[in-house]
Amino acid sequence: MGTIATNPEGITNPPIDELLEKTTSKYALVIFAAKRARQVNAYYSQLGEGLLEYVGPLVETTPQEKPLSIAMREINGGLLTAEPTDQP
């Protein structure tokens, strides 16, 4: 049988209200976190190939932690900034 995590992670940690303070809207937060999660995922994929095109996680991680959770913790920690673009 599985065990229940004592410290839930993901969308509950960091709290969504804290994350929304870091961006202009909830839609911007979704795009921001998704782009960073893709970069983290690509970084892990490239480790075995010796290609390091992307920057790895900026926070301490655990082996089972998902890239989206890592991205949200980086955003909440103020380690990343979102730059508005002129693209639609």
Swiss-Prot record:
Classification via InterPro entries: DNA-dir_RNA_pol_omega, Pol_omega/Rpo6/RPB6, RPB6/omega-like_sf
Query: Which Gene3D superfamilies does the entry link to?
Result: 3.90.940.10
Q: Tell me, what's a Pfam family for it? A: RNA_pol_Rpb6
The enzyme's E.C. designation: 2.7.7.6
Cellular component terms, GO, for this chain's entry?
A: DNA-directed RNA polymerase complex
What is the annotated quaternary arrangement, including any partners? The RNAP catalytic core consists of 2 alpha, 1 beta, 1 beta' and 1 omega subunit. When a sigma factor is associated with the core the holoenzyme is formed, which can initiate transcription.
Q: What does this protein do?
A: Promotes RNA polymerase assembly. Latches the N- and C-terminal regions of the beta' subunit thereby facilitating its interaction with the beta and alpha subunits.
Instruction: Provide the protein name.
Output: DNA-directed RNA polymerase subunit omega
